[in-house]
Amino acid sequence: MQSQITLTLNASCLRQPPKRGGAPVALMDIPEFVSQEFGLRGIQLPVDLIRGRTLREMEDLRHNADKAGCPLLVLSQDDPIDLGAVNDGAEGIARIAALGSAARHLGCGHVAIRAAVPPERIDAVIACAKRAIDLLRKNDVGLLMRSGHESMPDPSGLADIIRRIGGFHIGAMPSFADAHAFGDMGSAIRLLAPYSHMVEATVTGFGKSGHDKWDLSEAVEALRGVGYMSLLSIDWRGTKGDWVALVHKAQSELLAAIGREEQVA
């Protein structure tokens, strides 16, 4: 049976010009660029790319994405949100609600956040997350919790938080980088993949023997080993070289690991 893992792109790489000395891709042109350059059919959109944009502009971007056949799938927040604050997490809940409103106008089905989870306030974080999810549901948007924040529990702890929150509107969005930092990449991926709607395939560069920090095929094999059949977002985090060519290289290696030679539309 053919794997159903679908490659998408984290648009954070598009802050950089695709050609040396050129200009970055304009926000409204991102979906068409991703579709035509990489043949991908989905985008993870960092929230800072739309900061200051009007609702009309976000709806226009959604229209362009639909027209290009490259929808905006997840609106992601990099800066941590404090859901365990002593003020009952009201500020964090409001930030998530605002993300949900933006996601609705963009056509994103999920927002992804990094939450600060102090060990002594896990119960408060869970209660606040439930309140935030109630607000997100009004916009038909789900919540994904990202790993990697210094106060976030290990993968097992994050999985436990997601189980305790419960329901169909909560999930995880782990990354290869965070799984590698945990110390046992395969174990971290296997723990969180069953709760994940999207996984970030972090790519930092390539050497003579392949990816420079971890084996992309081993990471994909860990996903396949637990039956993961959802989104895998190519997340370029390198600082050297032709990033477009290197994203193409990552795409080829990931497709080979998934078991396909080309992206399925």
Question: Model features per residue range: what roles?
Answer:
Residues G21, R51-G52, A90, D123, ...:
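Residue-level marker of alpha-helix boundaries and capping positions
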Residues R41-H63, A115-E120:
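Glycine-rich, proline-tolerant flexible connector loops at the mouths of alpha/beta enzymes
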